[in-house]
Amino acid sequence: MSLIQSLKLVLARPHPAARPFLLASGAAALAGRALPWRPARWLGTASGLFFGFCLYFFRDPERVPPVDTHLALAPADGHVVSVEKVVPPDSLDMGDVPVWRVATFLSVLDVHVNRMPAAGTVTRVAYHPGQFLNASLDKASELNERNALRLTLPDGRNMAVVQIAGLIARRILCDAEEGMTYEAGERFGLIRFGSRTDLYLPPGVEPLVTVGQTMVGGETVMARL
């Protein structure tokens, strides 16, 4: 990645979910630095640092999906922590035939915006309260707080994306609702401060990624549909 590309990524506009954090920390930074008391200045400095962290964490860079519409794209940035065949969760109503699940772990330093892996219609949204285990653990898929979306492709096949909260992440944001139609790579949500995103491929579709591979949400090809 070139220096210019790196700067564009770091300086990308923040996601709307950052607004309350930026307003609060920005106001505290200005107030703290304006007051004559040393503790207030320390608080102002700390608030300024948190403001910078929020700008970086909530960055929302533009992505350019491939023109080929027969691809499943990464729903999130991060690195692949597991690729295995499993039976989809009952809440997705995708049957009991094992399909490939690709789990992507997002560290605090990754872009946390979630994107649709393919063009289609959201036909199910199911939220599950749960624990906040380390999202890189395999059991996080079943025990952690999560939000599952089933996406029906134009040809009628189903695939799914599951947003999973992690040890630090305590807030899943999802704009998608049942009946909404999305294009591949289009934004649909965000998970705050470290998380995991699972992609369930349609039956018969093989993954093209391996454990440890770095994902770029909305751009990296995970499978051919």
Curated annotation (Swiss-Prot):
Subcellular location, record wording: Cell membrane
Reactions catalysed: a 1,2-diacyl-sn-glycero-3-phospho-L-serine + H(+) = a 1,2-diacyl-sn-glycero-3-phosphoethanolamine + CO2
Main location: membrane
One term of GO molecular function: phosphatidylserine decarboxylase activity
Sorted UniProt keywords: Cell membrane, Decarboxylase, Lipid biosynthesis, Lipid metabolism, Lyase, Membrane, Phospholipid biosynthesis, Phospholipid metabolism, Pyruvate, Zymogen
Enzyme class of the recorded protein, top EC level: lyase
GO annotation terms (biological process): phosphatidylethanolamine biosynthetic process
Pathway per the UniProt entry: Phospholipid metabolism; phosphatidylethanolamine biosynthesis; phosphatidylethanolamine from CDP-diacylglycerol: step 2/2
Modification after translation: Is synthesized initially as an inactive proenzyme. Formation of the active enzyme involves a self-maturation process in which the active site pyruvoyl group is generated from an internal serine residue via an autocatalytic post-translational modification. Two non-identical subunits are generated from the proenzyme in this reaction, and the pyruvate is formed at the N-terminus of the alpha chain, which is derived from the carboxyl end of the proenzyme.
Quaternary structure (record): Heterodimer of a large membrane-associated beta subunit and a small pyruvoyl-containing alpha subunit.
NCBIfam families: PRK05305.1-3
Name of the protein described by the UniProt record: Phosphatidylserine decarboxylase proenzyme
Native organism: Gluconacetobacter diazotrophicus (strain ATCC 49037 / DSM 5601 / CCUG 37298 / CIP 103539 / LMG 7603 / PAl5)
UniProt gene name: psd
